[in-house]
């Protein structure tokens, strides 16, 4: 059996027809769905841009139609009922009239939904969005195999087919394997409810991609500090310096304000709650951050939105001459690909966090700071940086001051020579 879609009609909006072949008998069936011929991918038999809202919705309908029709055909074969043009047209009409995709009990998608609901009070919005990405990917995979997946279908055969699907659709290996591991999480969730699954046979070694991490070195940060810039770029420059010496996410450092500053054992700190993790943080301020505050009349710079900030820090790095070439990933269409580009082009709001971890790793004792290059490392890093222990705060602040004074000393000696 094969099932595909084709367009017909002489108007701008074309009719989408379903072409079904069963035992060498062809059926051409009307679906009531329409699309512009220019927006149709003739090779993949679907909209070209399945990520644009209206075409994503249309593609979901096409995937749902395939799954429901195959389910209908299987039921008629079991019941030994005739499959003809009339019965197929009625089935398509019934499927198209349904407002929502059929959610079958104990299907993989229904269990993923149940898991998300179960975890809803314990996860942040970014985690919820990531779960939805996994859900949508499994939903798309079901359309690809034209079948509803149930727990008994999730095994090593499922893994092989899903990997093949992911590679055909040009998803990164990271996306493919993270989705598979999420499905394993769902199986463990189901097992706790007393349902037997194949989770134990799914011994999958996660294939790690060589991640291209871009950071600013101490010399490059100094170069940015010493670069004269137009007035409209000075706030972004100051925030970039702040991010490189606090190591926090954009959502946190852009909300820094004087009223969040506290004194602990004579050390100036900033006290805040991280937006993503909801963890309370007390962080001693590096002298470079204090200098930025003093330059801004004992205040933090004016806050910027993330689009403006990302645009301006690229320009700042370009003006500062941070332009050597490197390999980095850039989004083209709907997928990220590796390109050789100038470093300033790769700079985004997260570079301060990565630079902080990289520049201080090995110079400050690892119990205080760990290089944040991945999720597991970041968790350890956050664990220590979130400690409210006063000895930790004083110790980290002293290390900041010692390194800063040494740098000033070296710079002075260089000038004298």
Residue ranges and their predicted role:
Residues 42-47, 113-126, 135-212, 226-227:
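N-terminal core-binding DNA-recognition domain of tyrosine recombinases/integrases
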Residues 255-292:
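Conserved tyrosine-mediated DNA breakage-rejoining catalytic core shared by Y-recombinases
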Residues 188-197, 243-266:
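Short, charged phosphate-coordinating catalytic segments
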Residues 299, 303, 314-371:
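Short, basic (Lys/Arg/His-rich) helix/loop patches that form interaction surfaces
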Residues 64-80, 106-135, 193-194:
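Short, aromatic/basic-rich helix-turn unit that serves as a nucleic-acid recognition element
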Residues 274-278, 366, 373-398:
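Catalytic-site neighborhood detector that most strongly recognizes the C-terminal catalytic loop/helix
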Residues 173, 177, 200-250, 305-307:
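Basic, Lys/Arg- and aromatic-enriched nucleic-acid-binding interface segment
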Residues 322, 398-417:
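C-terminal secondary-structure termini that scaffold catalytic or DNA-interacting sites
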């Amino acid at each position: 059996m094969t099932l595909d879609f084709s367009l017909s009609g002489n108007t701008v909006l074309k009719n989408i027809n379903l072409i079904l072949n069963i035992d060498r008998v062809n059926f051409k069936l009307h679906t009531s769905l329409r699309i512009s011929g220019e927006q149709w991918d003739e090779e993949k038999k679907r909209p070209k841009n399945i990520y644009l809202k209206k075409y994503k919705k249309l593609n979901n309908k096409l995937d749902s139609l395939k799954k429901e029709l195959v389910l209908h055909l299987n039921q008629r074969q079991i019941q030994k009922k005739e499959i003809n043009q009339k019965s197929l047209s009625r089935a398509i009409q019934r499927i198209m009239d349904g407002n929502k995709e059929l959610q079958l009990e104990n299907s993989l998608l229904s269990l993923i939904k149940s898991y998300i609901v179960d975890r809803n009070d314990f996860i942040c919005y970014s985690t919820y969005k990531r779960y939805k990405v996994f859900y949508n990917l499994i939903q798309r995979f079901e359309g690809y195999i034209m079948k509803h997946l149930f727990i008994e279908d999730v095994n090593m055969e499922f893994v092989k087919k899903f990997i093949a699907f992911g590679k055909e659709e040009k998803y990164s290996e990271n996306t493919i394997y993270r989705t598979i591991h999420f499905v394993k999480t769902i199986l463990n969730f189901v097992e706790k409810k007393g349902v037997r699954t194949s989770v134990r046979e799914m011994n999958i070694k996660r294939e790690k991609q060589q991640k291209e991490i871009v950071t600013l070195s101490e010399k490059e940060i100094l170069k940015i500090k010493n670069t004269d810039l137009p007035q409209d770029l000075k706030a972004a420059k100051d925030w970039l310096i702040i991010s490189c010496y606090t190591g926090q996410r954009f959502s946190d450092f852009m909300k820094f304000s004087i009223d969040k500053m506290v004194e602990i054992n004579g050390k100036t700190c900033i006290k805040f709650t991280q937006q993503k993790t909801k963890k309370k943080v007390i962080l001693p301020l590096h002298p470079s951050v204090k200098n930025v505050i003093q330059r801004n009349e004992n205040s933090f710079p004016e806050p910027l939105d993330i689009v403006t900030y990302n645009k301006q820090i690229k320009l700042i790095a370009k003006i500062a001459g941070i332009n050597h070439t490197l390999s980095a990933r850039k989004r083209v269409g709907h997928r990220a690909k590796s390109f050789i580009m100038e470093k300033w082009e790769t700079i985004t709001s997260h570079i301060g966090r990565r630079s902080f971890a990289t520049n201080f790793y090995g110079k400050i004792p690892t119990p205080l700071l760990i290089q944040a290059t991945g999720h597991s490392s970041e968790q350890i890093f956050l664990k220590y940086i979130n400690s409210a222990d006063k000895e930790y705060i004083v110790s980290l602040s002293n290390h900041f001051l010692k390194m800063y004074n040494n740098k000033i000393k070296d710079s002075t000696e260089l000038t004298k020579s």
